[in-house]
Amino acid sequence: MLIARNFILMSKSLAWSQASLQPWIHDAIDSLGFRSMTPVQASTIPLFCGNKDVVVEAVTGSGKTLAFAIPVLERVTKCMKENRGSSGLYGIVISPTRELANQINTVFHTLLQFYPEDQPPIKTQLIVGSLATVREDLNAFAENKPQIIIATPGRLLDFFSSNAVKRSTVEMVVLDEADRLLDISFQNDVVSILKKLPKQRRTGLFSATLSSAGDSIFRTGMSNPVKISVNSNKAESKPQSLTVNYMMVNPETKIAVLINMLSTLQYKKCIVYFPTCASVKYFYSVFQKLHPLEDVNLTSIHGQLLAKARLKAMNKFTEGDVRTSKHVLLTTDVAARGIDIPEVDLVIQLDPPTDPDMFLHRCGRTGRANKVGRAIVMLNNNALESDYVDFMEVKGLKMSEVESPDVIDAYKAFSKNLRNLMLQDRAFHETAIKAYVGFVRYYSKHAATSIFRLQTLDYIGLAKAYGLLRLPKMPESRFVPNDRMPEDGWLGEKIDMNKYAYADPAKEKIRLETMEEEWNKKVNDAKRRKELKVKNEAWSSKNEKKEGKQERREKMKRKREAIEKQIMNESSDEETVVDWKDLVREKKQKTSGISGSFDDL
């Protein structure tokens, strides 16, 4: 069922011939092989063409791009006729990523190939960061005079800062992946852009998970919008042609399991989602050096690549010939939204994304347009992560379990090769550590915090999966049980880090020079500490001698004073004794004198 505000449309696809469109658009649709409209197209195109603002929520792969591209081209064609071919900016499509913007631009170009040559041409311009400067974009705009702009928010806001861009003629604005454009990352830029545009315009919001945008929708300036929701009364939030499986895996064997699936499963093109840019760069390098995959054409893109490199890699994967080999794209969520790559029939997620809505977008890169597709997510083999299955079922996505392949022998062989590769180049180990630390940070940001908890993460198994020689020192290591923590963090045989060299001679030279400087600094510091200690000891000894001398002086003084006092006391007693003896002697003399006088008588 389709719910469009207060009325209901049957989810039956309609023939394109029943749609009131420009003849050249009918020719384009017929040539592209589309025999009937999808439900979202059948409901949206008449309303969006008929001066209605629309809010469209439909599952991935349901044909939303054509649902807004055709109304935009219809409106631009009418404006061109009304203005007798006069050029002006009539339509704007805003996308959150360069890749999606480039894809939308390609869809417009495909349709415009059927535009009548005797009419003034309709032109589009792609305005995204890194491909060109703002000045170059402005020069191209002034020279080509496009009627339609497909852009990313940041660059478009910079573009509109120039008075050379006349915005008063804009008739239609489309926000593709609107929930992403209205979240905290882009909302301010998008709202600022919309405020610069005429209020009397038609606005369309399109996404697979628009409900998460919440009240932000009301900041887009829409007038009495019509909400269109495809299959909103069904529990399933994925296309029926898409099968979603989950697999419980021990963390250390994840890469071995991935290699097994990429080697044994039947598919044409596969997208493998890694959690971070660092992990994409690291494992792409591992696969390039160890060559564990035969007859597989490997490509990688991530958010840290420059725009030109990203578009080149995406085009390589998109245009890959499936008749000659399998094609695998290692990527992050930069390739999760809106990207429509033909013949992608397998999606593998090493770990669930931090945002549950992104899980649906990742899975939706396959099983598009009623084609059969399969998505597999690996969950760490513990009780908590298994709860993610129930968590997603509440959100309308049912998953069935598939058994993990037996990869013990393959894991041991791969780990041995990876360790040997590590020992050849210190830089490779530093890249692995960066990817490992990035994953731990990524894991801590999960929305489902009750399921993905740092306390329950298997850090040892994860470190082995990344091929680390030694656990890095980080706060989260406190969650590793003491009985599992290896001695000094070594995950294998201990190596001498001073002799662990870079393969790049220039980097190794710098390392050795730095190590020598640090060693000399340590020696000099130790020497200075020793000298300071001796100096301190000398000063301390001198001070002690001085204090001892002073103490002896005071002691001698006290002793001298005591002796003098004693002498004084003794002198006083002797004088008393002498006086007494003198008196006795004097008395004796007197007595002797009297006795002599009697003798004379």
Curated annotation (Swiss-Prot):
Nucleotide-binding in keyword set: yes
Gene3D superfamilies in the cross-refs: P-loop containing nucleotide triphosphate hydrolases
Bilayer-crossing regions: none
UniProt remark on domains: The Q motif is unique to and characteristic of the DEAD box family of RNA helicases and controls ATP binding and hydrolysis.
GO biological process: one example: assembly of large subunit precursor of preribosome
Coiled-coil segments: 507-575
SUPFAM superfamilies, per database record: P-loop containing nucleoside triphosphate hydrolases (SSF52540)
Compositionally skewed regions (Basic and acidic residues) per UniProt: 532-554
Binding positions (ATP): 58-65
CC terms in the record's Gene Ontology section: 90S preribosome; cytosol; nucleolus; nucleoplasm; preribosome, large subunit precursor
Gene this protein is translated from: SPB4
Cellular compartments annotated: Nucleus, Nucleolus
Name this protein carries in UniProt: ATP-dependent rRNA helicase SPB4
Family named by the database record: Belongs to the DEAD box helicase family. DDX55/SPB4 subfamily.
Motif Q motif mapped to chain: 14-42
Catalytic activity from the UniProt record: ATP + H2O = ADP + phosphate + H(+)
EC number(s) given by UniProt: 3.6.4.13
PANTHER family tied to this protein: ATP-DEPENDENT RNA HELICASE DBPA, ATP-DEPENDENT RNA HELICASE RHLE-RELATED
Assigned keywords, A-Z: ATP-binding, Coiled coil, Helicase, Hydrolase, Nucleotide-binding, Nucleus, Ribosome biogenesis, RNA-binding, rRNA processing
Assembly description: Component of pre-60S ribosomal complexes.
